[in-house]
Amino acid sequence: MTAVSSNRNPEDDGCLLEQEPRGRRLSPRTGTPRTTAVSSNRDPKNDGCLLKQEPRGRRLSPRTGAPGTTAVSSNRNPEDDGCLLKQEPRGRRLSPQTGTPRTTAVSSNRNPGDDGCLLKQGPRGRRLSPQTGTPGTTAVSSNRNPEDDGCLLKQEPRGRRLSPQTGTPGTTAVSSNRDHEDDGCLLKQESRGRRLSPQTGTPGTTAVSSNRNPEDDGCLLKQESRGRRLSPQTGTPGTTAVSSNRDPEDDGCLLKQGPRGRRLSPQTGTPRTTAVSSNRNPEDDGCLLKQGPRGRRLSPQTGIPRTTAVSSNRDPGEDGCLLKQESRGRRLSPQTGTTRTTAVSSKRNPEDDGCLLKQEPRGRRLSSLTGAPGTTAVSSNRDPRTTAVSSNRNPGDDGCLLKQGPRGRRLSPQTGTPGTTAVSSNRDPEDDGCLLKQEPQELRKPEADTAL
């Protein structure tokens, strides 16, 4: 079943329930399979024209209700919306602006009195520029004559990409080290197959944000050795900047050399180490260095591999209980430190957090509300007088939260019954029971009468 938002009797919300034929998808607007709602060209006194029947295997246009058509937003007669119907040739995509295949709308270089110039024909297999309407061209945002938009047309050589800033292939715009009065210095020529730095215009260089002379931007040019990546902070390959354990008067200690092929820790500057945020002496930052065994990941909280920090069930006077050892290949619960368990937010004794441990059967997911697999909490159909209770339960008996799901079926979070849903209208305000809308029986018996 589905809910239909139009074509209904306002005094009878029952028409929201539209029965779905077997294996077919209902339209959420009409309740009829293979139909769509058309938002234009309809009789305002007759919403029935929303029902447009779809031919087999073809998609309807949501604006026109006709397959293989599109709505054109320009070049149309405002008194005749019928011109929205542009027939699409087989296998070709219509332009949403012009209604003509293989055309595009050009936002510049056109006669404002003649929208016909929107129709720019594309050669076979080539993409038109949305700015110029010419294939293999691009619009250049600088170095152009503001009185002559024609200079937007920069011709692209075969197989090469134009720079959107300069209109010249193999060039880039440099944001520093240039003469403000001469934008021509934006043109930095790229050597073959190498990428230019957007900051310096020189291949194989990078800009360093520290350890430089503020009066000499030339020190931005740090040459990169072959095949190695420069550090954006230091300009030296195989180094990293360390944010702790350094002399604030000597930025040189930012240079931590990395062994070949090994990644440095950004906190410690030592490979295969991590910074531990607890269990450390605040007067000795050296305890940040926790060595990781080969190929194993350290916990950022404990510095021990395959452990996790548990936020409950611990002695506040002893942080050591944060160390919960993980069994092989199994994930620990961050709340309990036990594998295949979950923390339940209700049905617990506030003086005994131990009841958070709910054991999960093999391969089944526990409900975070109830701690029982195949159950859900129901958030409606409750007694409005029981304010302390969040859902459909007896304040003295939380057990009624447990709604058992049949095998392999999903429970409704509103009703706790499979194959039902809650309807937000058409109900007796004094009787919330009418929220239970039952799914058709034949939908739950697949292949019972398929031969029919």
From Swiss-Prot:
Region (Disordered): 1-452
Bias (Polar residues): 29-41, 95-111, 129-144, 163-176, 197-212, 231-245, 265-280, 299-314, 333-347, 376-394, 412-426
Comp. bias regions, Basic and acidic residues: 177-193, 439-452
Domain of life according to the entry: Eukaryota
Name of this protein: Uncharacterized protein FLJ40521
Annotated source species: Homo sapiens (Human)
